[in-house]
Structure formats: C-alpha cells, structure tokens
C-alpha cells in the first residue's frame, strides 16, 4: 500500500511553480478521480495493478480487481482472506526529487519499489554532485528521461501504522 501521493506531488508542484495561477492549475491537474471523490465526502481508492513484463500480470490484475469489487460488496463472490499485516508492506510517499539539469543521471536503472539505504548513491547531478538517499526507503517512479525541472523520482518511508488505526 502506498499513501501520500497528493501531498508529495503538491510539494513538488509548489516548489517548481512560478506564480499562484500556475500553481493552482498544476495542482488541479494532480487531483484525479480518487482525490476528487474524497474531497466531496465520498470513498475512493486507486488500485494499481501494475504494467510490467511478468507474464502473470494480467491474471494478477484481474484477481486484484475482482477481490476489491467483492470486498466492497459491488459484485457477488467470496470475500478474499485478508492479508496479515506482517505479510504486507505499507509505504508513505514523502518527497519528490526533481531533475535539475538534462545532464543529471541515475547511478543505475532504478525500478519502482527498489529499496534504497540512507546515504546510498541514487544518481549524480550534471555538475558531479552525488545525489544520495537522505533516508532508507523505496524509490518510486524513477524517470531517467525526465526533462530538466520536472519530477525525477519519489522516495517513500515505511508506514507501519497503515491499516492498524481502526483495527
């Protein structure tokens, strides 16, 4: 599970914005269906089913969608057994890093959910300055081909309290 998308996205947008009008426009762009529904008092979630080269991914995605629909009571079926808390990983997106110059490069071909250790070299700025992980966590949405002054990657922290607040 990953939470914290909109706040982290908004922090990056605010940092890059030139004026209030641009900020408002770009923040509206970041508000998708889930955030809009929540803002109006509704219930919403985003179910990421992945898009990768795993040949089982279509079945995994179908099962995830059907399990969610059954669990929410939207279709008939047997409610899936809950995943024990100790078997799941919950993360909070906490910071987005920008590619500052076209010459900024990653240390290696990162993939979403790769683990990073505090102090680990993630990349190198065009001027040779190392880009180091400021804390241990996981990298999300690494974009090696990002343009200058746009999102380059996000970092997450573990969120051990996720889902336990009401249980």
Where are these regions (language model features)?
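Structured catalytic-domain cores with a bias toward divalent-metal coordination
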Residues: 1-167
């Amino acid at each position: 599970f990953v939470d914290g998308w909109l706040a982290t996205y908004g922090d990056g947008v605010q940092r890059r914005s030139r004026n209030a009008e641009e900020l408002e426009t770009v923040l509206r762009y970041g508000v998708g269906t889930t955030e809009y529904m929540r803002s109006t008092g509704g219930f919403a979630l985003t179910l990421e089913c992945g898009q990768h080269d795993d040949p089982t991914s279509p079945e995994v995605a179908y099962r995830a969608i059907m399990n969610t629909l059954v669990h929410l009571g939207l279709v008939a079926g047997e409610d899936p057994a809950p995943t024990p808390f100790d078997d799941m990983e919950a993360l909070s997106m906490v910071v987005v890093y920008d590619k500052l110059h076209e010459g900024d490069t990653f240390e290696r071909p990162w993939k979403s959910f790769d683990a990073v250790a505090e102090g680990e070299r993630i990349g190198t700025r065009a001027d040779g300055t190392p880009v180091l992980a400021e804390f241990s966590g996981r990298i999300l949405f690494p974009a090696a081909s990002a343009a200058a002054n746009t999102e380059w990657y996000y970092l997450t922290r573990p969120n051990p309290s996720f889902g336990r607040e009401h249980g």
